[in-house]
């Protein structure tokens, strides 16, 4: 794997960490102080929603990264009915017999069970064992972006007189960024939910030849 790819991969991870830090800082230190001036009920309800959203966001992010969907040679003994070859495929790169929906990731250089895609921003392959964590991570990432968008607008409208010119520019940029992020995450989440209902992975959607055919053996 080239050094350039490794550098780009690390930059993507650092960029993601910076975005997480900015969203956390903006919610907790820029917006929340304004909300403290509102009614106790509103403050408590909104504060609990914001905190819960962030807790679940980081929880599912952790599990998405921690849980591995790798299928390696030592896992071959887990396969049953080896004689039924149509249930399995052979990886030419790993030289192992694996479940048919497993695919070889050229970035991880490993076979991934029901591989959906390689997530560059998380530096992790999304597959059978961590896919549901990834979808939940997307849900709470979308909620976080939506909270930032709407609460920033709320603060701008209700505390107009307290904001100076620099604050307006800063808040305007955050409204634009959170709106774009929220829309992008929402569309991507809808796409993943569609794939889930259709029983497809991202790879199978992009490359129809990878879709399961019970009467053929697939090699890749």
Model-derived features with residue positions:
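Membrane-associated feature with strongest affinity for ZDHHC
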Residues: 1-220
């Amino acid at each position: 794997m080239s050094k350039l790819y490794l550098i780009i991969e690390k930059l993507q991870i650092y960029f993601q960490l910076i975005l997480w830090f900015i969203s956390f800082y903006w919610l907790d230190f820029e917006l929340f102080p304004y909300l403290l001036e509102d009614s106790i009920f509103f403050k408590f309800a909104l504060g609990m929603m914001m905190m819960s959203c962030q807790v679940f966001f980081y929880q599912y992010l952790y599990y998405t990264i921690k849980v591995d969907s790798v299928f390696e040679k030592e896992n071959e003994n887990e396969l049953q009915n080896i004689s039924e070859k149509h249930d399995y495929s052979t990886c030419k790169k790993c030289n192992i017999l694996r479940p048919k929906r497993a695919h070889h990731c050229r970035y991880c250089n490993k076979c991934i069970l029901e591989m959906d895609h390689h997530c560059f921003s998380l530096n992790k392959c999304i597959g059978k064992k961590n896919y549901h964590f990834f979808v939940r991570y997307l849900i709470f990432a979308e909620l976080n972006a939506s909270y930032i968008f709407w609460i920033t607008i709320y603060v701008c409208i209700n505390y107009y007189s307290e904001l100076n010119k620099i604050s307006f520019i800063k808040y305007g940029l955050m409204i634009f960024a959170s709106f774009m992020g929220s829309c992008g995450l929402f569309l991507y989440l809808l796409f993943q939910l569609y794939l889930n209902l259709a029983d497809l992975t991202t790879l199978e959607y992009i490359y129809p030849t990878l879709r399961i055919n019970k009467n053929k053996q697939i090699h890749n």
